[in-house]
């Protein structure tokens, strides 16, 4: 998936109020950019970080830049747009790029389901096969070695989604939790139970019930982001209590 216009480099001054960030362009101009990520963004919002912005000339938009990438000190990239993984997965599903989810002719996004007023990211259907309920989560936390971790803060909504998937699996349906790692310096995946113990417990219960856990990496450059192959998921229980 290519960015619609070329990204421009900048230096981050600060990120604040969850969805705002101040940065300085290479010509010295200070601007305010939209930050499309409500999470903690641990390790990705350090003052002075080199970032990449998507400019726009839409007269309806007050902010003329959107923050998209962080260029890490070692040259790797991290994507910070929390909504992008759904678009990447939608594209990959349509092209049959996710081996574990091939063979479904109907791909319906944002379908209502469950007992807790939820919407599944993708409902996959094919005559003669059980429907597949696929939930997608964005992951860009790395703290140790080449481990990608989720979540980077408490996510009650994420735990709710795991509960809904657990119910589907227990009733004999196909339930899939798909994590998309928006970092190029990670090679495997696990949870961060110290940051959200409740999510880790819900994850263990979901996996024990038969929820399939998938993880895919991404290739990230200032030109675009694409979904890559599967990453191994830590098979051990994730909760610490």
From Swiss-Prot:
Recorded hits in InterPro entries, A to Z, give: SfsA, SfsA_C, SfsA_N
Instruction: Give the domain of life.
Output: Bacteria
Question: Which region is the signal sequence?
Answer: none
CDD domains from the UniProt entry: SfsA-like_bacterial
What is an example of a GO molecular function annotated in this UniProt entry? DNA binding
What are the transmembrane regions? none
The family assignment reads: Belongs to the SfsA family.
User: What protein am I looking at?
Assistant: Sugar fermentation stimulation protein homolog
User: From which organism does this entry originate?
Assistant: Jannaschia sp. (strain CCS1)
